[in-house]
Amino acid sequence: MNYNIEGEPLPVVICNLEANETMITEKGAMSWMTPNMKMETTSNGGIGKMFGRAFSGESMFQNRYTSMGGPGMIAFASCFPGCIRPFQIAPGQEIIAQKSAFLASTSGVELSVFFQKRIGAGFFGGEGFIMQRLSGNGLAFLEFDGHIKEYELAPGQQLVIDTGYLAAMTGSCQLEIQTVPGIKNVVFGGEGLFNTVVTGPGRVWLQSMPVSQLAGAIRPFIPTGNYSYITG
């Protein structure tokens, strides 16, 4: 399988498959494909993994697209302005990603639930108690909001991240929550009560425009039920 990622900031990944190669995706992620791509909806791992995907923000079922009788093509477009990034997954090299980041993968990649070790990280970190874990062996495509900045953290090196900007990290990183010090900072700083702290070793991917931040910015401009139009 080979691929091209085109069209940022409204990207699409176009995958060209050999005969009998398979791509796995979430419900509704397919954008266009050749007629010989056969779709099969599956639980892909049984009841346990179905509910694990549901808890991590994904659909309980997944779609498998297989190229039948020869080469085929299938495309997956991002649902929000941002970028699509490829991740090579290998045994022992997991990727932990924000909820709803998974777009598509080859058949060797497993998507499961990731429980943060420190419960406070889930309740106060802004991205929920559960994240996504990608493991196995294959190629995965993740979609992120806005521009992506990557950092390589040395052992013990830390990065303090505002809520929602953590897009993904390698499984070797540790995640915890740090309280913003000082009542004045909390009340007047406008940055909330907590920050996410990621500790290396490992790689971290940050996104520049989390959809939650964008929603908060435009919410004051959305008409409510009491809004009335002036007509002539």
Q: Residues of each region from the PLM?
A:
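Composition-driven recognition of glycine/serine/threonine/acidic- and proline-rich low-complexity segments
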Residues: M1-G232
